[in-house]
């Protein structure tokens, strides 16, 4: 078998959180392409993962935790934003030199820098061209070997798991924000923004991905804001069904936020920071709103609350935008190019 027609991944897909969710959707694209998919978990509890039954039913081969003995020369091994993968590279490269690292962040891991200097990563993959150029510039200073490749791909997003809500008949105006539990995912003025935007109905918000770290940063949410630690307390589907808008000021610069696709597929209009991957994902004024200041967040949230017809039009446009950016055909074509390049890497 051509080694590029099968792929090994270090890690396990998930239903919540950036890298795990990203991996899940890409596995679906690879299977649709006829790629043979193998998972080498990095956690011994992988059999308890929610997606374990689905992976087996789809024909994905799941090996033992860190079971590198299954690798043959020429097998590509990918990892999505995994520090554990970087730490294992010396051992992995005793079996295959086709090591591929996908950094989901806008910054570099220190271990990633070291691995680049040592020539342990054969290919770097990115979802965002701007991030690729920035990272490549920094990494090339550490190792100018032209055989090390830097590519972008078009990530697949599976919209079937999210229901599009064209109309929400409730007595309140639903809003919220969603992320993993990380204080940096919250802007310090989050509560100020939620308090001061106005709506013709009572506001009700959900903060999904909230714990003591967020509270230490932004303060205790108002009584009309429900908080949930993760999807086990409040699922993504429940969240988007609730939210007319996703009002999400953060202190981070996002790379290619999966929650953007989820919101667009669900009919929740995005009101987000005017930086990072949001600038490529959101068509300002047509599919969502890009904000430079807390006043922008307050204004656009109020506008969406008082103009339901405009909000509905933007939600429909955003749904089409999600298909344009993350559709299966475009993603498959992109991944074909990536696998063709992987097949050219030294074995």
Regions found by a protein language model. Name each.
Residues 11-24, 183-185:
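A short, glycine/small-residue-rich beta-strand->loop->alpha-helix junction that serves as a flexible
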Residues 107-148:
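A short, active-site helix/loop in glycosyltransferases that binds the activated sugar's phosphate group
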Residues 244, 267:
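A short alpha->beta transition loop at the rim of the catalytic pocket in nucleotide-sugar-dependent
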């Amino acid at each position: 078998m051509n080694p590029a027609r099968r792929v090994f991944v270090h890690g396990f897909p998930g239903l919540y959180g950036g890298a795990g969710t990203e991996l899940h959707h890409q596995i679906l694209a690879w299977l649709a392409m006829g790629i043979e998919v193998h998972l080498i978990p990095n956690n011994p509890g992988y059999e308890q993962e929610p997606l374990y039954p689905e992976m087996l039913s789809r024909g994905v081969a799941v090996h033992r935790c860190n079971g590198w003995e299954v690798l043959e020369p020429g097998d590509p091994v990918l990892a999505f934003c995994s520090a554990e993968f970087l730490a294992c590279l010396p051992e992995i490269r005793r079996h295959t030199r086709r090591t591929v690292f996908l950094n989901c962040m806008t910054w570099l891991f220190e271990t990633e820098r070291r691995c680049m200097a040592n020539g342990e990563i054969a290919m770097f993959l990115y979802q965002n061209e701007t991030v690729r150029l920035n990272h490549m510039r920094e990494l090339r200073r550490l190792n100018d070997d032209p055989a090390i490749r830097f590519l972008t791909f078009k990530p697949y997003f599976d919209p079937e798991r999210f229901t599009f809500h064209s109309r929400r008949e409730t007595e309140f105006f639903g809003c919220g924000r969603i992320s993993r539990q990380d204080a940096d995912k919250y802007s310090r003025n989050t509560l100020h923004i939620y308090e001061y935007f106005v709506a013709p109905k009572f506001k009700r918000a959900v903060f999904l991905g909230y714990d003591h770290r967020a509270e230490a940063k932004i303060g205790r949410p108002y009584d009309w804001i429900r908080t949930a630690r993760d999807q086990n307390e409040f699922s993504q589907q429940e969240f988007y069904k609730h939210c007319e808008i996703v009002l999400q000021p953060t202190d981070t610069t996002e790379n290619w936020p999966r929650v953007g696709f989820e919101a667009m597929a669900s009919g929740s209009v995005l009101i987000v920071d005017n930086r990072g991957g949001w600038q490529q994902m959101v068509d300002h004024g047509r599919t969502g709103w890009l904000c430079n200041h807390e006043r922008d967040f307050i204004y656009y949230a109020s506008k969406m609350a008082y103009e339901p017809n405009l909000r509905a039009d933007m939600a429909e446009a955003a749904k089409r935008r999600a298909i344009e950016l993350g559709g299966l055909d475009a993603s498959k074509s992109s991944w074909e190019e990536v696998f063709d390049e992987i097949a050219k890497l030294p074995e």
